[in-house]
């Protein structure tokens, strides 16, 4: 069974790329480019094995989405992707799984998402 990944990314050049890369590596991908839509999807009970999350989104900020997932105990299912090195360093110090944009290694992205997804506890509440 294919792992389900939610890609929350508003950059028009990146979300199709993430979608294509992850589908090529046999993930079932849902892409949302707005934080408010992402929150609705996460609250409606749709299960995901992994989530990639941009912090700077239109609508609900990615930080708020992350905090909601953290309160539910689902932060371990998130790979935060940010263009801001200071944010990445701060997140990594706190133990958050994070990558800096641009993601220069397809293998690193796929490996991180696979590692998260294979924990086999889908995000569902």
What do the predicted segments below correspond to?
Residues 81-82, 101:
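Hydrophobic/aromatic residues positioned on beta-strands within the core alpha/beta folds
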Residues 9:
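Conserved acidic carboxylate
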Residues 54:
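Active-site residues of response regulator receiver
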Residues 34, 61-64:
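Acidic catalytic/metal-coordinating carboxylates
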Residues 58:
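The feature encodes the CheY-like receiver
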Residues 12-30:
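Two-component/phosphorelay signaling modules centered on CheY-like receiver
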Residues 31-50:
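Acidic, metal-coordinating helix/loop segments flanking the phosphotransfer/catalytic sites
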Residues 63-75:
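Short amphipathic alpha-helix used as the core "switch/output" element in two-component signaling
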């Amino acid at each position: 069974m294919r792992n389900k990944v939610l890609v929350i990314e508003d950059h028009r050049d990146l979300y199709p790329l993430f979608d294509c890369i992850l589908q090529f590596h046999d993930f079932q991908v849902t892409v949302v480019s707005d934080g408010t839509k992402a929150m609705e999807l996460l609250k409606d009970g749709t299960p995901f094995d992994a989530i990639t999350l941009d912090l700077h989104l239109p609508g609900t900020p990615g930080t708020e989405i992350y905090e909601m997932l953290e309160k539910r105990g689902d932060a371990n299912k998130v790979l935060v992707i940010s263009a801001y090195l200071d944010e990445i360093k701060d997140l990594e110090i706190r133990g958050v799984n994070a990558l800096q944009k641009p993601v220069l290694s397809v293998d690193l992205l796929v490996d991180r998402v696979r590692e998260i997804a294979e924990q086999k506890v889908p995000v569902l509440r």
